[in-house]
Swiss-Prot record:
Gene3D superfamilies to which the protein is assigned, alphabetical: 3.30.230.10
PROSITE patterns for the chain: RIBOSOMAL_S9
Protein name as catalogued: Small ribosomal subunit protein uS9
Phylogenetic placement of the source organism: Bacteria, Pseudomonadati, Pseudomonadota, Betaproteobacteria, Nitrosomonadales
Keyword line: Ribonucleoprotein, Ribosomal protein
GO molecular-function terms, A-Z: RNA binding; structural constituent of ribosome
Family to which this protein belongs: Belongs to the universal ribosomal protein uS9 family.
Organism: Nitrosomonas eutropha (strain DSM 101675 / C91 / Nm57)
GO cellular component terms, semicolon-separated: cytosolic small ribosomal subunit
Gene behind this protein: rpsI
Keyword presence, Ribosomal protein: yes
GO terms (BP aspect): translation
Length: 130
């Protein structure tokens, strides 16, 4: 018999996380590494555990994540979004709790493009009066 996985896709900035959850002992693996090894900063580790701690599923679900693109902060946000969607697929009653915490909503902020004649997206070239 096949193992029953629940799936969720999470996105943040340019990072995309594919999250698979199944009943287990609370092991989180990100790109075939333990989450504590993959995310070097404590804030990243804290962000990915937020939806699990909120719903009380931090010790009874195994999570496998494949992630591509972005930096460490964007990847952590994408994993959180993916875990949230997978938890909703796992148990529909958790949706109200997770949406009140703001985890269901996709953070749509992206990097603004650089404009022609500017140094950065909004930073203009230095003006010289003389």
């Amino acid at each position: 018999m096949a193992i029953q996985y629940n799936y969720g896709t999470g996105r943040r900035k340019s990072a995309v996380a594919r999250v698979f959850i199944k009943s287990g002992t609370g092991v989180i693996t990100v790109n075939h590494k333990p989450a504590d090894e993959y995310f070097s900063r404590e804030t990243g580790r804290m962000i990915i555990r937020q939806p699990l701690e909120l719903t009380g599923n931090s010790t009874n679900l195994d999570i496998m994540v494949n992630i591509r693109g972005g930096g460490e902060s964007g990847q952590a946000g994408a994993v959180r979004h993916g875990i949230t969607r997978a938890l909703i697929d796992y148990d529909e009653t958790l949706k109200s709790v997770l949406s009140k915490a703001g985890f269901v909503t996709r953070d749509a902020r992206e990097v603004e493009r650089k404009k022609v004649g500017f140094r950065k997206a909004r930073r203009r070239k230095q003006f010289s009066k003389r």
